[in-house]
């Protein structure tokens, strides 16, 4: 995701310094017109720094620093903005916003809906929140990354909550797509025809159309790998527990994802919920996409 996004920014004429943790990535990034580095200090002179990282801990390390490594808060100039596009907890977002504020810096949360292919095609949907002046400063960049930006408030944590709940709608839909496809297949019918029927009538949205067809085709090649999906589910359940809101459907999805990973499917997409559903039903399965 991050590489595709950085490439699009560079193609739009923005000078991009790409900080990576793995030196072997530098050749690829250089070929894309980026200025790659493994030293976070090289971005300290930037007006806006974008982070696209896997989890709370990774974003905290970059923003707050660790051990002898200076983070963005200590390194960026007052007035600079940290544009955090990772899917993280609301607690982490609030902590980071407060830390940047102490240094006179802005913090905008802008997680995205969309897979790596959508990132390449600039078809992401961005969910942004932060101080209005900071969001507007970031908008020219966001416009090059996605097809639409939804501003959901001034508290960065609100963007992360919206993103997590959106992912839970997708995750529970994947579970039901997997279960219904397993039944259709076990009864000797074509799940693809079922998905076409449903998406042509009552369920015409992107999730049912795109992921439904992938589950029907038993296509589990990773776009959003199961461990990252499980991370988001756990974050969502943490938010639910904090608010005393039961989310039993999401709890089921968490357990199914854990089952998939325990069966050796950690490298597969979260569409592999369909594979687990088929196996649980003793329905015919194709393992061509499994390790």
Model regions and ranges:
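NAD(P)+-binding Rossmann beta1-loop-alpha1 motif at the extreme N-terminus of oxidoreductases
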Residues: 1-52, 80, 116
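Rossmann-fold dinucleotide-binding core
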Residues: 63, 87-168
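Hydrophobic residues within alpha-helices
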Residues: 5-9, 96, 141, 183
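Rossmann-fold NAD(P) dinucleotide-binding segment
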Residues: 40-106
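Helical "substrate-binding/catalytic lid" subdomain
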Residues: 156-280
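Hydrophobic beta-strand scaffold residues
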Residues: 16, 36, 106-108, 149, ...
């Amino acid at each position: 995701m991050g590489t595709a996004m950085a490439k699009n920014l560079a193609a739009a004429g923005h000078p991009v310094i790409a900080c990576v943790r793995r030196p072997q990535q530098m050749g690829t990034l250089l070929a894309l017109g980026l200025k790659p580095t493994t030293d976070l200090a090289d971005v300290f002179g930037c007006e806006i720094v974008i982070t696209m990282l896997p989890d709370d801990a990774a974003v905290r390390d970059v923003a707050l620093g660790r051990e002898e490594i200076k983070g963005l808060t200590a390194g960026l100039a007052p007035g600079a903005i940290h544009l955090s596009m990772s899917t993280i907890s609301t607690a982490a977002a609030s902590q980071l916003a407060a830390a940047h504020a102490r240094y006179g810096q802005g913090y905008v949360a802008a997680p995205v809906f969309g897979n790596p292919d959508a990132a390449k095609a600039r078809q992401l949907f961005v969910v942004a929140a932060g101080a209005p002046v900071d969001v507007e400063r970031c908008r020219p960049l966001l416009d090059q990354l996605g097809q639409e930006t939804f501003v959901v408030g001034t508290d960065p944590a609100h963007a992360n909550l919206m993103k997590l709940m959106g992912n839970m709608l997708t995750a529970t839909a994947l579970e039901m797509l997997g279960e219904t496809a397993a039944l259709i297949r076990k009864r000797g019918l074509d799940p693809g025809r079922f998905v076409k029927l449903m998406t042509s009538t009552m369920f015409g949205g992107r999730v049912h159309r795109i992921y439904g067809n992938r589950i029907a085709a038993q296509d589990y090649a990773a776009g959003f790998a199961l461990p990252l999906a499980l991370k988001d589910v756990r974050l969502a359940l943490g938010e639910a527990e904090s608010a005393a809101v039961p989310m039993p459907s999401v709890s089921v999805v968490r357990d199914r994802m854990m089952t998939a990973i325990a069966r050796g499917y950690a490298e597969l997409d979260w569409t592999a919920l369909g594979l687990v559903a088929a196996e649980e039903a003793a329905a015919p399965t194709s393992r061509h996409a499994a390790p």
